[in-house]
Amino acid sequence: MILKALPNESMPREKLLQRGPQALTDAELLAIFLRTGTQGMNVIELADFLIQDFGSLRQLFSASEQEFCQHKGLGQAKYVQLQAVLEMTQRYLAETLKRGDALTSPEQTKLYLSSILRDRQREAFYILFLDNQHRVIKDEILFEGTLDAASVYPREVVKRALHHNAAALILAHNHPSGVAEPSQADRRITRRLIDALALVDIRILDHFVIGDGESVSFAERGWI
């Protein structure tokens, strides 16, 4: 179908303006980003083809430059645009989180941590350093690689927490396997960190394990 043949209210841009972005399908949202189709496909057909070819919208967004650019209708300019959009989204989430209380917006916290960690190919140990009002002072990745009791050093965590004058921490790490269920090693590491930080009156408020499309909160499980 030629895009111009669609009723005006069915055109992605007009539909968004009339009904809001939540009313659009993944393909329609992507079509707005792509702007133009290719020979033989209008922009919505191209968007739908790309989502099916990559497997999902998220897999398209997390593709490498080489994977992205080898697809019909895409190229380096679109890749750069997409990376800019994703970075702006991440910065928006970070700014929103840092302006509020990390505990009163747990879903926002999960969303932000997922955006940082979900698609990483290696395990990464991430910390939110909070003040006594539970506002974010600083966030950083402290360890990367295969995380176990030997590779996450409580002394280094304590050192960074004192450096930032933190009153509390929220921990997070990803499981590249995609399975968010915490391991026994995850629980042991968390307990060691709780004990080490208690010596300097710093609390761990939660530890999130980030998987593929899901996350597990230690606090919600009653483990903290």
Swiss-Prot record:
PROSITE patterns: MPN, UPF0758. One of its GO terms (biological process) is proteolysis. InterPro entries: MPN, RadC_JAB, RuvA_2-like, UPF0758, UPF0758_CS, UPF0758_N. It holds the Pfam family RadC. Keywords: Hydrolase, Metal-binding, Metalloprotease, Protease, Zinc. Gene3D superfamilies: 5' to 3' exonuclease, C-terminal subdomain (1.10.150.20), Cytidine Deaminase, domain 2 (3.40.140.10). Residues 102-224 form the MPN domain. Belongs to the UPF0758 family. This is UPF0758 protein VP0184. It comes from Vibrio parahaemolyticus serotype O3:K6 (strain RIMD 2210633).
